[in-house]
Amino acid sequence: MKLGRGQHLGYCTNIHPGETWAQVGASLQAHVPLIRARVCPGQPFGIGLRLSAQAAQTLAEPAQLAEFRQFLRAHDLYVFTLNGFPYGTFHGATVKEAVYRPDWRTPERLRYSNTLADLLAQLLPGEAGLQGSVSTVPGAFKADIATAADIEAMRRNLVSHAGHLVALGRESGRHITLALEPEPCCFLETIAEAVDFFGQHVFGAASVAELAAHAGLGPAAAAAALRDHLGLCL
């Protein structure tokens, strides 16, 4: 819901189990309108939508997306942020380190994140100044990162995703940011680790050059775009 001064408070749907889009949709219909009626009756109600890779692929189908957008309009709901952290099963199973896989070394994580951004661009209201965000894993589970090549693979995929977000912004007019979420026992666990990874790798010269070539930007614009589209959530 809108708090004023451009701030939004959302109801995070990852509290409810649901791995398929059918399960997620049923949960939304059962719970969210009732919660909105109690929390902010007569006002728009923001949702932080959690989608697994499987659910995201289903929602990306035009008929499914059109039906969901109609549901949002009918109940005065809007989506401005997505939880793209758990790729697969999140409820009803022992997740532990498996929740971080596939991680940012892999094409699967990149494709999943691109799909989420595409969906959010179609769901995000056209309100002036409203930007979308997608949360994601903090790179990888720390024990899985053993070599410089692992770090380089994460860097390259994050830069590729930034290029996707730049292109998406040009096409849709929607600004979306990917937010890595530091957690214990992960590659990004502390502020110092995050500052080092972003400063030395994500925002480094190689990343600027890659994004400039990928997105047709000058070096200064590419450096700014990396900072505009890649960050942290705490």
In which residue ranges do the predicted regions lie?
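N-terminal pre-domain/capping segments
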Residues: 1-132, 153-163, 227-230
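Active-site acidic/histidine proton-transfer and metal-coordination neighborhood
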Residues: 93-227
